[in-house]
Design a protein with these regions (language model features):
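C-terminal amphipathic/interface module of NAD(P)-dependent oxidoreductases
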Residues: 191-230
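Glycine-rich "substrate-gating" loop/helix at the edge of Rossmann-like oxidoreductase active sites
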Residues: 56-61, 88-95, 115-125
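Active-site "gating" loop of Rossmann-like NAD(P)-dependent oxidoreductase/epimerase domains
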Residues: 35-59
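Alpha-helical substrate-binding/gating segment
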Residues: 102-110, 118-153
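Non-catalytic, hydrophobic alpha-helical segments
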Residues: 125-128, 132, 147, 158, ...
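Mid/C-terminal beta-alpha module of Rossmann-like enzyme folds, strongest
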Residues: 135-187, 221-230
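NAD(P)-cofactor binding segment of oxidoreductase domains
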Residues: 1-32
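Conserved beta-loop-beta element that borders a ligand/cofactor-binding pocket
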Residues: 37, 70-93
Length: 230
């Protein structure tokens, strides 16, 4: 419970502090972009979640996400646009989510996780930067935006694509029961792997943003320094 309180407060209290600071500014910033999470949506294998028609989920991580956004939009700021980015899993070089995926594939464990049908919503780090700059330039945009690539994939496709890019043929699957045991051992949540996050960035696409890395194979090739001719 203490850890959960710390996780929640680390997000809501810092957001409130930023809001209070902006209220005191004589020349407030034109734009306040606050981080959020695509985990706010429910487990979805039946349809994609858009900003307009996505269904909010339940559970601790979802409650954190909701309170985080609530903290941002609780401030009425006449001169500052407020944007909440519901960020999917960020893929980039030098760490982050790529590290465990690469290790699994290298050790021959890069098969599907669980039944492999759960959707994986992701975004390349460069497109996170790209979205931020786009939002800064397009001054009519505000509110909630899904920060995710337009082409999410299921877990089977995710792992198969990574194996192909890394040129490793064997990838043993990890059943759900094994993932749950492993999660307990390393004190994390199996939900991180087994939850189906099917999120699409409808609003930013409608506004005209062009993704640099719309497809997972392109993202993996860039991150791992490989070209399609290799």
């Amino acid at each position: 419970d203490k850890n959960k309180a710390e996780i929640l407060n680390s997000r809501t209290e810092t957001t409130k502090a930023l809001g209070e600071a902006i209220l005191k500014c004589k020349n407030p910033p034109e734009l306040w972009i606050n981080s959020g999470t695509a985990t706010i949506y429910r487990h979805s294998e039946d349809r994609p979640m858009t900003e307009k028609e996505g269904e909010i989920g339940t559970g601790f991580s979802v409650n954190v996400a909701k309170e985080w956004e609530k903290s941002l939009f609780s401030f009425q700021l006449a001169k500052t646009r407020q944007v909440a980015l519901r960020i999917a899993i960020v893929l980039g070089k030098n760490g982050g989510a790529m590290v465990p995926f690469i290790k699994l594939v290298k050790f021959g464990l890069g098969g599907k996780q669980g039944n492999g049908n759960q959707m994986f919503s992701w975004i390349h780090l460069e497109d996170v930067f790209g979205m931020v700059l786009f939002l800064q330039s397009n001054k009519e945009l505000e509110g909630v935006f899904n920060c995710s690539a337009p082409n999410p994939v299921d877990n089977k496709t995710l792992m198969k694509t990574l194996r192909q890019v890394m040129k490793i043929k064997i990838g043993l699957p990890s059943p759900a029961w094994l993932l749950k045991i492993g999660a307990v051992i390393i004190k994390t949540e199996a939900e991180l792997i087994l939850k189906s996050r099917w999120v699409v960035p409808e609003r930013i696409l409608e506004a005209g943003y062009k993704f640099k890395f719309p497809n997972i194979d392109e993202a993996f090739n860039e991150i791992l320094g490989k070209s399609k001719s290799n």
